[in-house]
From Swiss-Prot:
Subunit structure: Monomer.
Classification via NCBIfam families: adk (TIGR01351), PRK00279.1-1 (NF001379), PRK00279.1-2 (NF001380), PRK00279.1-3 (NF001381), PRK14527.1 (NF011100)
Name listed for the protein in its UniProt record: Adenylate kinase
Originating organism: Pectobacterium carotovorum subsp. carotovorum (strain PC1)
Main location: cytoplasm
């Protein structure tokens, strides 16, 4: 079961990815984690990636694809994998296909931008424990304070409204075209494409995913 999750940041992919991993026993492959692991392990590809990153440059698509290919050949991917945050662009999707990385399911999480902004900008975090609150959807007992320790809650740098809006613009320019790309792939019988309304309750989205994935 090889799955790609598509959707803007804050569309709820992370929550559902956790559920899919646990239910179906497949690992989530995040390109960021994968790059860090390869650099730490000192593999040939990891050394190349480190050189590029140390120079302050972006790692090339070719190198990321090679890392993905190496990663999915590992034992824990025998039953499949879940790709998170990759591919981000059509050239990356094409490159994946060219090296024989096929996917069974592409699931798009559809959520309007304004709701995403609402979701992300309202987040508050207790840095020491990682506990996450939301001023509207999951408020702490005392405003601005962690329920357990009473310590101050903070706003992550990425959760400021101007940053979120920039990320959404980037998503619509770069990643949204993958929606029509994978719809065409599904029409050609190369994958199965599903659109999930991410505005609903977590449990409702989860139930739909179970129906889709079986």
């Amino acid at each position: 079961m090889r799955i790609i999750l598509l959707g803007a940041p804050g569309a709820g992919k992370g929550t559902q990815a956790q559920f899919i991993m646990e239910k179906y026993g497949i690992p989530q492959i995040s390109t960021g984690d994968m790059l860090r692991a390869a650099v730490k392990a000192g593999t040939e590809l990891g050394k190349q990636a480190k050189e590029i990153m140390d120079a302050g440059k972006l790692v090339t698509d070719e190198l990321v694809i090679a890392l993905v290919k190496e990663r999915i050949a590992q034992d824990d991917c025998r039953n499949g994998f879940l790709l998170d945050g990759f591919p981000r662009t059509i050239p990356q999707a094409d490159a994946m296909k060219d090296v024989g990385i096929n996917v069974d399911y592409v699931i798009e999480f559809a959520v309007p931008d304004e709701l995403i902004i609402d979701r992300i900008v309202g987040r508050r975090v207790h840095a020491a424990s990682g506990r996450v609150y939301h001023v509207k959807f999951n408020p702490p007992k005392v405003e601005g304070k962690d329920d357990v320790t009473g310590e101050d809650l903070t706003i992550r740098k990425d959760d400021h409204e101007d940053t979120v809006r920039k990320r959404l613009v980037e998503y619509h320019q770069q990643t949204a075209p993958l929606v029509s790309y994978y719809q065409k792939e599904a029409d050609a019988g190369n994958t199965r494409y599903f659109k999930v309304e991410g505005t609903r309750k977590v449990e409702e989205v989860r139930a739909e995913l179970e129906t889709i994935l079986g």
